[in-house]
């Protein structure tokens, strides 16, 4: 909880990336949100599943499903809304990479109906360099206002599928702002020198129809029916190991924090 301010507090629901928790990164963002007057609830999707909190999914990017993470987030939202210290009308999510990608599901009413249950609507979302590899073809959006920040040179989570999904959400009536951080790699807000290494990437733009469960990979044209065929071959060509680059500058971090601060002010009237 923040050192100053009045109850009930606005809340940032902090969503970890696939890299797990790092005090040098996640801890600093949490302190920053506290200084802005926000209570923080961060979701640890790893420990209870016997996974390393520090290591997350690792470079193999495996061990836990998106649906499991989304279910955890909805549970956290319900918990926060039931706490009298928290203002249920002023809750936002924040996450980078996988933590941002999970928010793509939160923007869809279909996922909310499948995994969320009652009373999980919140005020907004902030996604940095999100993963947008699996989306609803024709989404019916939820009401939260989203800020999506994309790295111009992100070679881990490609910006294009996110722009495509954001456009479809906007056409369906969603309140979503998309901005590109010039020259930015993946995780540009690390405030660490850029470095490259190999990791599993999901360079996919897979869209599905919830009514029929027909899905297609937009990039290579592969089509499947999830109910009949399973999920396998639609992913075959777009999930692979590749060179990724992470890191950025203090200037990029400062710009990002100011943009996040403005979105919070606009969304919550603070």
Which residue stretches match the model-derived regions?
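C-terminal catalytic histidine-bearing segment of alpha/beta-hydrolase fold enzymes
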Residues: 175-270
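Primarily recognizes the serine-hydrolase "nucleophile elbow" in alpha/beta-hydrolase
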Residues: 21-25, 65-142, 155, 160
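Short beta-strand/loop motif that positions the catalytic acidic residue
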Residues: 148-150
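Short aromatic-enriched loop/helix-cap "lid" or pocket-rim segments at secondary-structure transitions
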Residues: 53-55, 139, 189-195
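Short beta-strand-to-loop junctions in surface cap/lid or active-site-entrance loops
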Residues: 1-7
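Serine-hydrolase catalytic machinery in alpha/beta-hydrolase-like enzymes
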Residues: 11-82, 241-242
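Residues at the C-terminal ends
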Residues: 34-35, 141, 171
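Conserved loop-alpha-helix segment in the C-terminal half of the alpha/beta-hydrolase fold
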Residues: 162-173
